[in-house]
Design a protein with these regions (language model features):
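Generic low-polarity alpha-helical segments
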Residues: 1, 27-28, 281, 288-294, ...
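Bacterial N-terminal signal peptides that target proteins for export
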Residues: 2-12
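Residue-level detector of intrinsically disordered/flexible regions characterized by low predicted structural confidence
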Residues: 9, 34, 307-308, 312, ...
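Bacterial N-terminal signal peptides
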Residues: 11-22
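Intrinsically disordered, low-structural-confidence terminal and linker regions
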Residues: 21-124
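Mobile, glycine-rich extracellular loop/lid and propeptide segments
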Residues: 52, 75, 102-250, 321-566, ...
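Small/polar beta-strand repeat architecture
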Residues: 250-322
Length: 712
């Protein structure tokens, strides 16, 4: 399970992906790729923040590149990239469904030719109900003040992109300090309405003795997670965690020490674990509704309340499923981690002096088993190995000091790490650790969100709240929007991935400069299928009113006419184009979220006419009335973008979300006929709310699931 993820394994998996989806994406006949048939098991599909920041437009057909060695080499590199493989699995479900004669899709996933099939750790979950009434969305209380965080994402592990499973799970960080009653990180399974038992169920929850404010990433098989936490003192820490499922509801046998009236002590013949603390327990002499207070061994524990009667040795004790607080983990040494049995974790403190991390999420490279992450002092840290079975370690002290100000989340495209800083510069770092610094593209607060990289087109995008437009002329687009006054703009910056220190950038202006953070947008399905489409972004007016913006783009660059020129251009900028304002989403100042896109054409191919959704949220004062979210509220909205949106396009659905949402992730595009309650989105609220499926504990920050089609 912990083998090194070798280049051979990844290349093998990528090679097999050409069987099937290559026919659709590249035009290369499957018959040319002599690969043996696959075994019937499947390897799962992780989805975390990194899959929203490293993307791949259509790389073209085999015939288009076969006679050009350089183009062919790039074509192969793209097809061997794990995230390209996973992207194609999600967008071409008809092939992943494996029609007769095609290879099974498990080999389209990471390490498929080498890594063994993986099964959930812990007791199996029950299968789906034969018949079920759709329950709609769920929301679970993660604790007072708990949230994934603005611009941060939960992480989802699916065992298939075309068939939902009740063992699929989603992981949320909580952004509050862990304790015996508060999880630092929590996962839910039994996600879909047609699963039996409690929907959802707490799969596992851990107190890691720190605060996790940053997006988590998943290992290839989903059996480990990695994240950065802030401990009570000292530098930020990279945490590697092997999880184990909370014990299922079960019946244990009372041991030799009977339940005694007035005593809290009880024993069993076997079967207790530390994760039973807080679980419900019932039996003769145990007060109704009592819980387990402590577990001292596999056979001994204490009740929360004194027994009110006497039990007998050998009688049954019922333990409630999925109840109880988080399991508190104590970190093992780095050298002990590869061999430890879950649940266990290890920590690696960032090297350097006073190294904190407030906005940089770890980026995992599947091929080399490496994590890259930035810190608040401009250091770029590299950890290798991490999940692969040998002692995890940091490389360098740190690996590269690229800046002196806070770094964004880094994005690695297979050859270079791209990262922004709070001073408004982009950096490209090669494999030897040499950093290339761009021209300045943004003023304070610089580049907060990680770059968006289209590896196929060779473009890197930065979304900035205040560009480097301080010398705007009175004829600039932002001046026109600001009563003729000179002012900075907010917008999207584009540079080639091979930029140098003097390379000029292009910009698509999305509004007057704002104090809001401008998070990354998302390409629509038109861009993926035709190479000509749009980026949708949640930008803002100068008064901090979030607005949905449509940025016309091709694989060659921004595609609208220039709207700023001559002396009005920002320093080091070659062209400025203006995005289309679709609709202002609030009536008063509020904050926005990243934009997430999904083409959901069921088990059919995504074409330019397929149903395409985008999702984004506002933190309050929403002015777009929908069935699920009346005006005046903080709302998450969705639009169907099968064709480009026109001005004032109304959202197709909305849902109340206290103070807005974190980044939004997608599970699958499974038709309702295969498993009711699939094809969902996942996020957290950014403030306490009413978490409708959490019983009486329902007033904290909510982990939410909602439908893609109607947000219900």
């Amino acid at each position: 399970m912990h083998r090194t993820f070798s280049k051979l394994a990844i290349v093998g998996a990528a090679f097999v992906v050409l069987i099937g989806i290559t026919v659709l994406i590249t035009g290369q006949p499957a018959s040319k790729l002599r690969v043996q048939s696959a075994s019937p098991h499947r390897v799962g599909v992780p989805d975390d923040w990194t899959h929203h920041h490293l993307v791949f437009s259509n790389p073209g057909t085999y015939e288009q590149v076969a006679k050009d060695p350089a183009a062919y080499a790039k074509w192969l590199t793209i097809h061997y990239d794990t995230r390209f493989i996973l992207q194609q699995m999600k967008r071409h479900a008809e092939d992943a469904a494996s029609p007769s004669g095609m290879l099974e899709p498990q080999y389209l996933a990471i390490g498929g030719l080498r890594l063994p099939p993986w099964r959930p750790i812990g007791p199996p979950r029950p299968g789906p109900k034969p018949k079920s009434t759709l329950k709609g969305d769920w929301s679970m209380d993660m604790g007072t003040g708990a949230k994934v965080g603005a611009g941060m994402y939960p992480a989802k592990f699916s065992f298939d992109t075309t068939t939902a499973s009740c063992t699929d799970f989603v992981v949320y960080n909580t952004s509050v300090a862990g304790s015996s009653t508060q999880a630092s990180i929590v996962a839910y399974d039994n996600l879909y309405s047609s699963c039996t038992g409690q929907v959802p169920s707490v799969y596992w929850a851990f107190n890691t003795s720190g605060t996790v404010r940053i997006s988590v990433v998943l290992s290839p098989h989903g059996d480990q997670v990695a994240f950065v936490q802030t401990p009570s003192s000292g530098n930020a820490q990279l945490v590697l965690l092997k999880w184990a499922a909370k014990p299922a509801g079960r019946t244990l046998t009372s041991g030799g020490t009977n339940i005694t009236n007035g005593s809290k002590t009880f024993t069993t013949t076997s079967g207790l674990t530390s994760m039973d603390v807080g679980a419900g327990i019932s039996g003769t002499g145990i007060p109704a509704g009592d819980t387990i207070a402590t577990v001292t061994s596999a056979t001994a524990g204490t009740l929360t309340n004194n027994a009110t009667g006497n039990g007998t040795s050998g009688e049954s004790l019922a333990i409630t499923a999925d109840a109880g607080g988080p399991d508190t983990l104590t970190a093992v040494g780095n050298s002990s981690y590869p061999g430890c049995a879950g649940p266990c974790m290890t920590t690696i403190s960032f090297s350097g002096t006073s190294r904190s991390d407030t906005i940089s999420s770890p980026f995992y490279d599947y091929l080399s088993d490496t994590i890259y992450v930035g810190d608040a002092s401009g250091g770029l840290h590299k950890f290798n190995p991490v999940f692969g079975g040998t002692t995890p370690a940091e490389v360098g002290t740190p690996w590269v000091g690229v800046s002196t100000t806070a770094l964004s989340s880094p994005v690695y495209d297979g050859t270079h790490v791209f990262v922004g800083d709070a001073s408004g510069f982009l950096y490209s770092v090669n494999s030897s650790g040499t950093a290339t610094k761009s021209v300045q593209v943004a003023a304070s607060p610089g580049i907060v969100d990680g770059p968006l990289v289209d590896s196929t087109a060779g473009h890197v995008y930065a979304f900035v709240a205040q560009d480097y437009n301080s010398t705007n002329s009175s004829t600039s687009p932002c001046a026109a929007l600001n009563s003729g006054l000179k002012t900075v703009c907010n917008g999207v910056i584009q540079l080639p991935t091979n930029f140098g220190t003097t390379t000029q950038f292009t910009e698509s202006v999305t509004g007057v400069g704002t104090t809001n953070t401008l998070y990354d947008g998302a390409f629509d399905n038109l861009y993926w299928t035709t190479n000509t489409g749009n980026i949708y972004a949640n930008a803002a007016t100068g008064a901090n009113l979030p607005k949905l913006m449509e940025i016309h783009v091709t694989t060659s660059g921004f595609s609208t006419a220039a709207c700023q020129s001559g002396t009005g251009l920002p320093t080091n900028c070659s062209a400025v184009q203006c995005a289309s304002n679709i609709v202002t989403m609030t009536s008063a100042a509020a904050a926005g979220s990243p934009v997430t896109e999904i083409c959901n054409n069921g088990l059919s191919a995504c074409t330019s006419s397929s149903t395409d959704y985008i999702f984004t949220s506002v933190s309050g004062s929403g002015n777009l009335s929908t069935t699920g979210c009346a005006t005046g509220n903080a709302c998450v909205y969705s639009w169907v973008t099968t064709t480009a949106l026109g001005a004032s396009a109304a959202p197709t659905a909305g849902l109340v979300a206290a103070a807005g949402t974190s980044g939004i992730i997608i599970d699958n595009t499974v038709p309702s006929g295969t498993l009711a309650g699939a094809s969902r989105v996942y996020f957290s609220t950014l403030s306490n709310g009413t978490c409708t499926t959490s019983g009486t504990l329902n007033t904290g920050g909510c982990a939410v699931q909602a439908s893609q089609s109607a947000l219900n």
